Design a protein with these regions (language model features):
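EF-hand and EF-hand-like Ca2+-sensor regions
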Residues: 11-45
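Single conserved hydrophobic/aromatic residue that forms the stacking wall/gate
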Residues: 1-10
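Chitinase-like catalytic core of GlcNAc-active glycosidases
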Residues: 36-164, 172-175, 179-180
C-alpha cells in the first residue's frame, strides 16, 4: 500500500525517525501551537523541576551544595526543592534528612536562588519546601525567605485572584512562589 511505502521511506532515511516525527502527517509538532501563551492557570503547564537540587553525588552520602541550585536555575528549572532541617545555632540547613549527606546553610541557598532565579528564564520560580524544622527555626526560615527574596516572593494573593485557581505565569511574572509540606 502507499501508506506502507511511505513508512518504509522513513525507515530507510538516516534520520528517518526525526523525519517521521516532524512530518505534517505524523508529527508531534504542530505549527498552530508554536507560540506558547502564558495566560492559563500555572497548573496547565509542564514545569521544569529539580528534585534533590542540593545534592551532588549519591543521596545517601553525597555533598549538599549551593552549586546544585545555580546549575539547575541556569539550565531553566522553574521548581527547585529545599529540604530544610534544624541546624546548629538556630540556623536552618538544607540536607537530605536521616542520611550521611553534608549540610549547607539555608541562608546561602536562598542567596544563590535570589541571584540566579531569573537569569535564564523570566517565568515564575516555585520553591518546593520540605520543612522539618522546629517552630523557632521555621520562623528563621520565613525571615530568610522574606529578607533574601524581598519583592520576588509572593506573600499574599494577587489582586483579582480567583480562590482555588492558580493565576497564570503571565500574571506572576518574575516572582518566587513557595509550597511547603
Amino acid at each position: 500500500s502507499i501508506r506502507r511505502q511511505r513508512q518504509d521511506v522513513y525507515k530507510r532515511q538516516p534520520d528517518g525517525f526525526c523525519a517521521y516525527m516532524t512530518s505534517r502527517q505524523h508529527g508531534a509538532y504542530h505549527a498552530a501551537y508554536s507560540e506558547p501563551t502564558l495566560d492559563a492557570p500555572l497548573s496547565s503547564y509542564f514545569i521544569s523541576s529539580s528534585h534533590n537540587t542540593y545534592l551532588e553525588g549519591g543521596q545517601w552520602k553525597g555533598d549538599s551544595t549551593v552549586e546544585g541550585y545555580v546549575r539547575a536555575l541556569l539550565r531553566g528549572a522553574r521548581c527547585v526543592e529545599l529540604d530544610c532541617w534544624d541546624g546548629p545555632s538556630g540556623q536552618p540547613q538544607v540536607t537530605h534528612g536521616h542520611t550521611l549527606t553534608s549540610r549547607v546553610p539555608l541562608d546561602d541557598v536562598v542567596a544563590a536562588i535570589a541571584q540566579y532565579a531569573f537569569v535564564s528564564s523570566p517565568y515564575p520560580l516555585i520553591l518546593s519546601l520540605e520543612v522539618h524544622n522546629d517552630l523557632a527555626q521555621q520562623e528563621v526560615l520565613a525571615s530568610i525567605l522574606r529578607t533574601q527574596l524581598g519583592d520576588m516572593l509572593v506573600t499574599a494573593p494577587l489582586e483579582d485572584d480567583v480562590p482555588g485557581v492558580l493565576p497564570s505565569p503571565e500574571r506572576y511574572g518574575t516572582a518566587s512562589l513557595s509550597s511547603a509540606r
